[in-house]
Regions:
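Preference for long, amphipathic alpha-helical scaffolds in soluble/luminal domains
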Residues: 1-311
Length: 311
């Protein structure tokens, strides 16, 4: 991935089969032979959605029979008639953060069919007044408790048209990155406009501030957005946000400066970056939470610098 994304070398002679790596083998469910637990497909770190996403991060793509079987199983259980993806709750409702994330990984892996274009239309049609996305049936502690105890979705969709409710950072980055990935293979004015509006959502907030200007520290156990991790599903940090802004072509906007300088200031003397955030949805968030040097965070920072340098 470093050769491909940083050095620009994607020649066949440098390819390594990721399917044979220990990282991929660890993700395969021993009973079904699929990536992750398909019966509990929405679980972080063990469900098929997570294991599919991590496998794509590790280099697996649509040429892999293993990935194809897993994608088919996820489609069978999680895709909705409206084009979005649902979690394991009743009634079944599409949710923006997971729809955006899964679509992005499908596009990254090289998939291209009407289910993806329908999903992109779902995203475009649900962008909100502030340029972001929300579209989550959970709102507040009661809905969270209902989900945990009864796997019931809540009443959060009543907030969609409420302009006093700010869109969600997690849902917005998921949908925005999906649009960026789609734009690279099928550009359109509608997608360009949506990407621009989403970029403004983050830039107005310096990529980590609330509408009131204070740094966001989520109340649900997730940590400060200025702490770097490697978001996979339903997560965010400033490096993730900056990479989206870079893909949107706006990395030189002055409003990126504070977040960009924070990232640069975190580089270690040997050129690496540390894994600092282990919130649920971050890679390695289910393991040791000791801050340490990370090849994943370093790779992501180098991706950002490569795009910024070429802009």
């Amino acid at each position: 991935m470093t050769q491909r994304d940083i050095l620009g070398d994607d020649s066949p002679g440098t390819e390594v089969d990721p399917a044979s790596s220990p990282g991929i083998e660890r993700l395969i469910h021993h009973e079904t032979g699929l990536l992750g637990d398909i019966e509990h497909y929405d679980l972080f770190y063990g469900g098929s959605m997570w294991c599919f996403a991590e496998a794509v991060e590790r280099g697996l793509d649509c040429r892999s029979p293993l990935l194809n079987r897993t994608v088919d199983a996820i489609y069978e259980r999680a895709i909705m008639p409206d084009g979005g993806f649902t979690l394991q709750w009743e009634p079944r409702v599409s949710v923006a953060c997971r729809t955006g994330d899964i679509l992005r990984y499908l596009i990254m892996a090289g998939y291209s069919d009407t289910r993806i274009s329908n999903g992109i239309e779902w995203i475009l049609s649900r962008q909100r007044h502030d340029g972001g996305w929300l579209h989550c049936p959970l709102a507040g502690a009661c809905d969270q408790l209902r989900l945990v105890l009864f796997r019931r979705s809540g009443n959060g969709l009543t907030r969609e048209g409420d302009t006093s409710v700010t869109s969600c950072f997690y849902a917005t980055i998921a949908c925005a990155l999906a649009l960026c990935a789609y734009r690279a293979v099928d550009p359109s004015e509608a997608v360009d406009r949506a990407v621009g509006s989403a970029a403004e959502f983050f830039l107005r907030r310096s990529l980590f501030r609330s509408s009131q200007g204070t740094p966001i520290r989520p109340h649900d156990g997730n940590r400060d957005f200025r702490l770097l991790g490697y978001p996979v599903l339903s997560q965010y940090d400033i490096l993730h946000g900056l990479l989206f802004i870079a893909h949107a072509g706006l990395i030189h906007d002055p409003r990126c400066g504070e977040a960009f300088n924070i990232v640069i200031s975190k580089q270690n003397p040997d050129g690496t970056w540390n894994m600092e955030s282990f919130a649920t949805g971050m890679l390695e968030g289910d393991g040791s939470r000791r801050i340490r040097k990370s090849k994943w965070v370093t790779l992501k920072a180098l991706r950002l610098l490569t795009i910024a340098d070429s802009s």
